[in-house]
Amino acid sequence: MSTYSARFGKVVRELKSTAVVSVNERFGDTKAPPAQVTALWDTGAYSSAISEKVVDALGLKPIASVRACGVSGWYDSPVFKIDLQLPNKIKITGLPVSLGKMVAADILIGMDVLSMSDFNFTNKGETVLSIRTPSEGDAPFVADTQEAARSGGGQYPFV
């Protein structure tokens, strides 16, 4: 099992970390050195995407194309296969990624990657992002809340 936690020092609306992207040896020239990148963790993204900057830096060649949808709408996108090392040192090999139209990060980590791990974030005073790979099971928030209600707690106003 591998774990990772990042403390942001305040409540944030973007979950970012570093990651390492490299050429998948079956689909490209492995002479390009791995690239340390800024990763944006996006639970609303079905799949992961990389920036044109990373594609160019690694000399990635497309293996297919897809119709993708981002915040700016639908577009045709090439697909690349990469190797991705997460901050918890877990390496995902042969990950298909589309070309994303991104400004805030070099790679967008979507649910295709997040679903391989236990992933949560908390916001009590500061944002803390936690990842555990492989998945060990659920986080029993409902059971915890029901127990708090039985013991006299359990009021959670939206502020």
Question: Language-model features: where?
Answer:
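Pepsin/retropepsin-fold aspartyl endopeptidases
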Residues: 1-159
